């Protein structure tokens, strides 16, 4: 049975990486419902948050394949119950309608929307929440002449995660290129090059 999964992918910031990741989804005919990319809590490491609707077996296989990419450090997949997630939406509404209709103002307050731009001809409101809340406000504002609407990709934090920081520190500690090289001839250079 298909379930909604959120994949959290920790990567290096490399040109073309988004394309490599997208190709992996495309080859498997997996549709991306949402995709967000941002810096993580560690400098130089980026975090992709991708939402898909697939079976657990397909997602597990995809995770294994993604982790084989050179620039990918770690991939996690979680159900909605295992994460805290939000989206942001912007709604553009005719200012005259807002001033005239008390219901609209009450509705915006009920959904926790706040004005980010107020002009004579329109007002832009911002609301954060989950799909149901954002779509419900969209449905309600459509009754009052909604001019424009846009919704962001999902951002999520894994509830039981300790973050990737400790894993990165362990990887750095085990990196063979970082270990000091002992050169037995370092202090005897005058003797080595004598003829």
Predicted regions located by residue number:
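Long, contiguous binding/interaction regions
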Residues: 1-46, 51-195
């Amino acid at each position: 049975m298909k379930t909604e999964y959120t994949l959290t992918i920790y990567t290096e910031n490399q040109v073309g990486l988004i394309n490599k990741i997208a190709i992996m989804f495309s080859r498997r005919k997996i549709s991306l419902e949402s995709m967000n990319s941002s810096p993580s809590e560690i400098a130089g490491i980026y975090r992709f948050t991708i939402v898909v609707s697939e079976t657990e077996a397909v997602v597990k296989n995809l995770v294994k394949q993604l982790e084989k990419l050179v620039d990918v450090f770690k991939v996690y997949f979680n159900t909605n119950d295992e994460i805290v997630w939000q989206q942001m939406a912007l709604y553009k509404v005719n200012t005259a309608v807002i001033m005239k209709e008390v219901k609209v103002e009450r509705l915006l307050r009920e959904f926790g929307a706040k004005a980010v731009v107020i002009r004579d001809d329109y007002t832009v409101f911002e609301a954060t929440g989950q799909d149901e809340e954002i779509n419900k406000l969209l449905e309600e504002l459509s009754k009052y002449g909604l001019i424009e609407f846009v919704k962001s990709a999902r951002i999520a934090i894994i509830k039981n995660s300790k973050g990737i920081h400790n894993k990165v520190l362990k990887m750095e500690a085990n990196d063979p290129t970082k270990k000091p090289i002992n050169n037995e001839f370092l202090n005897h250079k005058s003797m080595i090059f004598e003829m």
